[in-house]
Amino acid sequence: LIGPVLGLVGSALGGLLKKIG
């Protein structure tokens, strides 16, 4: 259960960083 959640969080975080950067 934690694996998929971490994947979603990582994907969202990556998108945010790309937006800010």
UniProtKB/Swiss-Prot annotation:
D-allo-isoleucine PTM sites in chain numbering: 2
Reported tissue expression: Expressed by the skin glands.
Main subcellular localisation: secreted
Subcellular compartments: Secreted
GO biological process annotation, one example: defense response to bacterium
A GO CC term assigned to this protein in UniProt: extracellular region
Record keyword Secreted present: yes
Family listed: Belongs to the bombinin family.
Name the record gives this protein: Bombinin-H4
Organism per entry: Bombina variegata
